Amino acid sequence: MIFDHNDKRPPIVVLCGPTAAGKTALAVRLAGELPVEVVSADSRQVYRHMDIGTAKPTSEELAAVPHHLIDVVDPDENFTAGNFCRLGRQALNDILGRNRLPIVVGGTGLYIQALLHGLIDVPDGDSELRATLLRAEQLHGEGTLYQRLQIVDPVLAKRLPPNDLVRIVRGLEVYELCNRRLSDLQAEHAGQKSPYRVLTLGLTMSREALYERINHRVWRMLEDGLAQEVEFLLKRGYAAECKAMQTIGYRELVQHVLGNLSMDEAVRLIQRDTRRYAKRQLTWFNKVNSIIWLDSFGEFAKVLKLIDSFIYAA
């Protein structure tokens, strides 16, 4: 792997991949060899009190290496990719200021993308305009908004399925609010250079091995007290309907606690939905050409060599 010796941007390492691939364990192991700190890029680990079901680092792992962007907000608070970008970049710059190497560890592709490349500067959503657009779809029939998008932003329309109403509405919303095509804004943003020099490593394994690890981890979470964690959250007043409680592992056990689902069925659904989530993560990351894929186990020496070459490329 050849790195650019003339690139003077500050270096960061990204360690990504599907859930249960062993990212945290590798980051902790790297901390034994390198002066690193971890920035968690996990959309659920930002929530306080949700420890077991989000597979947060253990107390031993947290003691081994400083972690950032964990336990940031309560489960009933809103947290967006924009929030993550702002706080994450602050953490990166703080770590770099201490002459340490930031390692971004996680499987939330959108958060990683926002951190590295920022977010498109578009207006916030307008609930009144959105409601007007949705009423037009109801009044004039299914496909009305998609046809409208084909006229005002044909490039975006070509990318979207005709039934993806959320993104269709967003495209029309942006056009109405700033008189710019969202596809043009996306193209302009894609051409911008990241403020960081990035080495992106992806952990992978065979699908069979990954699914086996996922199934086993679900059982381990239950043994560690995931059902009790869900009961605790409900007793603290976090509603079953709040966004964090509707994520995998929590929504199923909420239904079990409420008597609507047997434990066996809850486990089956958690395992199934986690496998599906891992598949979606891989689909996202497989579109990122810069990722160097590594086997989750047995390539530690290669990881160290890659990071060493990357750091001293500048």
UniProtKB/Swiss-Prot annotation:
Cofactor(s) of this protein: Mg(2+)
Gene Ontology annotations of biological process type: tRNA modification
GO MF annotation list: ATP binding; tRNA dimethylallyltransferase activity
One matching Pfam family: IPPT
Gene: miaA1
Keyword Membrane attributed: no
Marked site positions, Interaction with substrate tRNA: T108, R130
Catalytic activity annotation: adenosine(37) in tRNA + dimethylallyl diphosphate = N(6)-dimethylallyladenosine(37) in tRNA + diphosphate
Keyword Nucleotide-binding: yes
InterPro entries: Dimethylallyltransferase, IPT, P-loop_NTPase
Name the record gives this protein: tRNA dimethylallyltransferase 1
Binding site for substrate: T19, A20, A21, G22, K23, T24
Amino-acid positions noted as binding ATP in the UniProt annotation, renumbered to this chain: G17, P18, T19, A20, A21, G22, K23, T24
Keywords: ATP-binding, Magnesium, Nucleotide-binding, Transferase, tRNA processing
HAMAP family assigned to the protein according to its UniProt record, in alphabetical order: IPP_trans
Annotated coiled-coil segments of the chain: none
EC numbers on record: 2.5.1.75
Region (Interaction with substrate tRNA): 42-45
Organism: Syntrophotalea carbinolica (strain DSM 2380 / NBRC 103641 / GraBd1)
Subunit structure: Monomer.
